[in-house]
């Protein structure tokens, strides 16, 4: 993978242009490679970020990548060989106390080509976005909502609340809408102390699909996700930390095919706690 990321800052404006060439070599014809591994020379970011009055309030326009919160729903992958990019706008405001709100209105960029033969051959095709796939969101962060109020452990509490909306249309999906509402709270690790993270997410939506025989089916989407982590960091030079984790994500019930219950990770990373899982096809 070869990546070039250039930025230029002038008078409250930040121009950014990033290109990347991600290829494969020596893969077998029956390999599991896809657009998550290969994306021949393409533009990942081409944006301008404007300061609106001050750097505490900004507006980003163009193509960009982003990380939000735990990165479970929106992320710029670290281990995966290709990125998630969006065409649109991102508005961010940070208050003097550190509280932040971000609003985005985008069209997710589809990595092309998608067919396996082209991926294995490292074929080139411009990535593109479409009005048939739209992604919106609002994300709020409170870095220390209880600072100075508890006089102890929970002064370090950090909370997040957010809502995302994904709408899609295609040849087989006449209309699909998924709303994602989530809350997250954490106390980050420090030597000699316990830490924790808890996140809960609800998804609700509906879809209309066109079957191969021309029939139209309608169903709803109802999914949930929950995460809990409790850890302890020892006050030793090695920074030893032990932790207990629970992950839960709903799945489809084969008895009710008209209802989609599999949790949709949107544009997040998969099992990032375990490193480069893409090596194993996870």
Please report, for each region that a protein language model flagged, where it lies by residue.
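Surface-exposed loop and membrane-interface regions of Gram-negative outer-membrane beta-barrel proteins
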Residues: 1, 7-56, 68-76, 121-125, ...
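Low-complexity, flexible helical/coil segments
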Residues: 2, 6-7, 11, 53, ...
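Short, solvent-exposed loop/turn segments at secondary-structure junctions
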Residues: 21-24, 66, 108, 249
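Short, Lys/Arg-enriched charge-dense amphipathic segments
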Residues: 37-44, 81-87, 97-101, 181, ...
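Signature for the C-terminal beta-barrel architecture of outer-membrane proteins
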Residues: 54-59, 77-256
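Small/polar (Gly/Ser/Thr/Ala-rich) solvent-exposed segments
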Residues: 62
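C-terminal structural cap/anchor segments
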Residues: 240-282
């Amino acid at each position: 993978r070869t990546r070039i990321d250039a930025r230029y800052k002038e008078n409250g404006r930040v121009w950014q242009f990033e290109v990347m060439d991600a290829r494969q070599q020596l893969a077998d014809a029956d390999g599991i490679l896809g657009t998550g591994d290969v994306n021949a020379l393409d533009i990942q970011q081409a944006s301008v970020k404007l300061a609106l009055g001050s750097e505490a309030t900004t507006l980003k326009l163009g193509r960009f990548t982003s990380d939000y919160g735990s990165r479970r729903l929106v992320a710029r992958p670290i281990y995966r060989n290709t990125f998630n990019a969006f065409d649109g706008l991102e508005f961010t405001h940070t208050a003097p106390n550190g509280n932040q709100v971000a609003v985005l209105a985008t069209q997710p960029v589809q990595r092309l080509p998608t067919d396996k033969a082209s991926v294995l051959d490292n074929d080139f095709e411009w990535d593109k976005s479409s009005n048939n796939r739209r992604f919106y969101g609002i994300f709020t962060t409170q870095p220390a909502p209880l600072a100075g109020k508890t006089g102890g452990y929970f002064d370090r509490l950090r909370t997040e609340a957010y809502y995302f909306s994904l709408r899609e249309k295609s040849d087989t999906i006449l209309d699909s809408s998924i709303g994602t509402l989530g809350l997250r709270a954490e106390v980050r690790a420090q030597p000699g102390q316990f830490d924790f993270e808890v996140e809960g997410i609800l998804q609700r939506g509906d879809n209309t699909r066109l079957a191969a025989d021309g029939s139209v089916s309608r169903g709803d989407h109802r999914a949930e996700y929950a995460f809990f982590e409790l850890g302890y960091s020892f006050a030793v030079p090695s920074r030893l930390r032990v932790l207990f984790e629970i992950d839960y994500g709903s799945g489809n019930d084969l008895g009710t095919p008209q209802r989609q219950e599999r949790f949709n990770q949107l544009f997040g990373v998969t099992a990032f706690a375990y490193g480069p899982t893409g090596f194993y096809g996870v």
